[in-house]
Amino acid sequence: MDKITGFSDDELLVKILSFLPTKAAVTTSILSKQWKFLWMRLPKLEYHDDIKIYILYMRGGSRSRTDSILLEKSQRMWRFIDKNLPLHSSPVIESLRLTIYNELFQPESINLWVEIAVSRCVKELSVRFSPFKGKRDALLPTTLYTCKSLVTLKLRENILVDVPHVFCLPSLKTLHLSHVTYADEESLQRLLSNCFVLEDLVVERRVGDNVRNFAVIIPSLLSLSFEILGQCSSEEYVIHTPSLKYFKARDFGECSTCLILNMPKLEEVFVSTAGHNIKKLLESVTYVKRLSLFIPDNNAEAFTALYGDVIVFNQLEHLTFIIWEAYCSKLLYWLLIASPKLRNLEFNDQFSSDGMDTLVFWEQMITSVPQCLLSSLQTFKWLGNGDSIEGKDLATFILRNSCQLKTATISIGQGQNKLEIEKELLLHQNMDKISGISDDVLLVKILSFRPTKVAVSTSVLSKQWKYLRKRVLKLEYDDTECKTKPSKSSHKRFRCFVKRFCK
């Protein structure tokens, strides 16, 4: 039915304006007297300083006429917000988003604007304050931490988070804290410990943020992402999130230790660490179906230390393996061995350097093909560069040994060896699928396409064939013969057959 019935003309116009960027909505004020103040009733406000202002300050030196225009534009925006936000006529400000780079924006102004939004029952608040170097942090009003209407809070860069001892955010479901500074370690912990309906949490730490330890113990949490930079003074972090479904960890701390207690509902994981916590992280997520692993440069040794450990990903179906200036063939091979049900593999080495023993390694592995290549891998994707020998050798290994592969996507950039790599992979893509497979593996593969009864009958052919039937992956028992010729002996033979075969 007609969705606008019952709206007055002004209400309808405000509704239409709410779908426009705030800057565009403000420009409509010159159309007529009716439109002059309509934008001041908008429930959602978004003010973005030009990113070029930030680049200008970081560049330094003399300024051109264009630079002066940018500065004047930023100054006008500051004066506009400072003048009009206190007079905003909407009784409820559903959303306020501020992105600020200019030094002219004072921390006290940001404090005032946030306080106005809180007084208007704000639901979503996003503040990014990134002035040039040396600017002091913006301290937000204490009323923010008792805002009952607040559902989403996103703070970034030069924000000082000072959580009072008594606070209440009963509606907060999304909390993003990106490279902010905390008044003390207890501020972060108080905030994390008293958000009882929180579902989405992002904590990205920076050097000098006044935090050494933190614990995420939130029963309602569904998504968790955290980042610890290499120079951060971290000692320990604890994670206890029984409802968590998505987990992203970027841990480059040199001294931090992790303790992960309970994540039984986890479905997807992204892990990138400096290496010393990788074993604990992977041991705690062995039951996930989707895993993305990012290997940063100069950390290959820490990761390959896992090679041979008894960690099995019994449920893993999707693996994304990304390397950056690193050589990690051994770790990738170990992951393939540890993932017997893997269906989709993506390998990204667009920015990697090759190890000297790449080709030798994958050729040595030809006699020990991972089970997932023989029975489950259906999709392989390689994103590489034209000089990547490691990626080429991996792709060759996959194409040569994957028995169930349905789709192979090869995307490589420019490089001296691009054409040679493409030609070689094309040959492997069209080659027969039994090259390099041992006789027993090949025979078992053939038997898997035959009815179980027929496969069993081959056991009388020779000693080599005697026990091959026990390695067949697909079993099918059919008592049709018992139904067409029912007798006690036929039923007994069938039961004995099944019992003997399953031993």
UniProtKB/Swiss-Prot annotation:
InterPro entries: F-box-like_dom_sf (IPR036047), F-box_AtFBL13-like (IPR053781), F-box_dom (IPR001810), FBD (IPR006566), FBL13/AtMIF1-like (IPR050232), LRR_dom_sf (IPR032675), LRR_FXL15/At3g58940/PEG3-like (IPR055411)
Gene3D superfamilies: Ribonuclease Inhibitor
Domain F-box: 2-50
Xref: Pfam families: F-box, FBD, LRR_At5g56370
Span of domain FBD: 361-412
Protein name: Putative FBD-associated F-box protein At5g56410
Provenance organism: Arabidopsis thaliana
Phylogenetic placement of the source organism: Eukaryota, Viridiplantae, Streptophyta, Embryophyta, Tracheophyta
